[in-house]
Amino acid sequence: MDEFFLMNSFDLAGKTVYLRVDINAPVNPLTGEIMGIDRFRAHIDTIRNLRNSKVVIVAHQSRPGKDDFISLRQHAQILSHLLNKRVQFVDQLFGSQVNRAVSEMSDGDIVMLENSRFYSEEVDLTTIESMESSNIVRSLSPLFDYFIIDAFAAIHRAQTTLVGFHRIKPNIAGTLIEREVSMIERFRKIREKPKIAILGGAKIEDSIAVSENFLSRGFVDKILTGGVVANAFLWASGFDIGKKNREFIMKNNGDYEKLLDKCRAILSKYGDKLVMPTDFVMNPSGQRISINEKIPDDQILADIGLDTIVEYSEIIDGARAIFMNGPMGMYEIEDYSSGTREVFTAVAHSKAFKLAGGGHTLSALDKLGLTKMIDHASTGGGALISYLSGETMPVLEALKESKKLFEG
């Protein structure tokens, strides 16, 4: 972690600090209420460590055009409840109201600004130079002594409030980013074998990218698949997965033929290292079926079957390091939760180093009471996948450059 400024690199007491977090959360489409607060909890240590500073919080919620693209007023209330402390909400990201609120702050005060993605400069600008010339950066820069970036779940985004200040004043990695990077690097450096990945859920494109990257670099020895991800690989390998399962993949993936071609390429190169289910539980019938049998057109492959659970559990038991992202099936429905429950329980009881990521994965672990048995449950979804896949992380690069510019 020598590459970044950390929060103990400076005396922040009495200083005015900008704190960029990621508290992007699911929203109930009927009531407009925030439904999950895991990401809020993840930032509490960082905020409490700034108890003697004036803290101004910047964050985003969703993106333009989405139903959950809402104000952060509710987010401020949730943080206030978690901290047992007033969090003042200002319905601007920059401007006279923000200037006034910051000028009136005392040490220990917390202010939260409006959704950064309400402003086109947050999402439209693509170069650091254009960001530095933006109203966001020119208006906010003079207000702060230090900029703390703690939005791990957004480290793969090059957006103005994340990277636009790093050449202007010192940018510091927050407590959450420090912990996330430390634990993920620990996982990456494990050399003991076998090292496995468990990829499930419905995000086929992400899982294909991870599979290709992990296997081509020899990063893992085996990948166990479940959910829609497994269905895609099975379809690509020539199995008839049934009409409803084909339609789901076709409907939810634009150029699905291209995805299937990528699956075929991975299977051609690394077929012996990619493990697919051999049996399933169907919805709505609830019956078990082998992948070699004819799958009725009206049935969904809703969970992995007993034979697959046994096979996967044996592989997990012998592993030295495990990365898990995505459930094995429709775990939210009790009748189709066995695969996820048994596989995740096997991981939790494994002696391996265990890294988990993705919203549905963390939700399932929490529901099963297994979170504390996982070495690291990451707040990153797409960010974690991108990081583990070896992609450049704009936020981490900006933090590194900021240290080079301002140290000594």
UniProtKB/Swiss-Prot annotation:
Subcellular location, principal: cytoplasm
Coiled-coil annotated spans: none
The organism's place on the tree of life at top rank: Archaea
UniProt: substrate binding residues: D22, I23, N24, R39, H60, Q61, S62, R63, R117, R157
Keyword Zinc: no
Gene Ontology biological process: gluconeogenesis; glycolytic process
UniProt keywords, alphabetically: ATP-binding, Cytoplasm, Glycolysis, Kinase, Nucleotide-binding, Transferase
SUPFAM superfamilies reported in the protein's UniProt record: Phosphoglycerate kinase
Reaction(s) this enzyme catalyzes, per UniProt: (2R)-3-phosphoglycerate + ATP = (2R)-3-phospho-glyceroyl phosphate + ADP
Similarity-based family: Belongs to the phosphoglycerate kinase family.
Protein's name in the database: Phosphoglycerate kinase
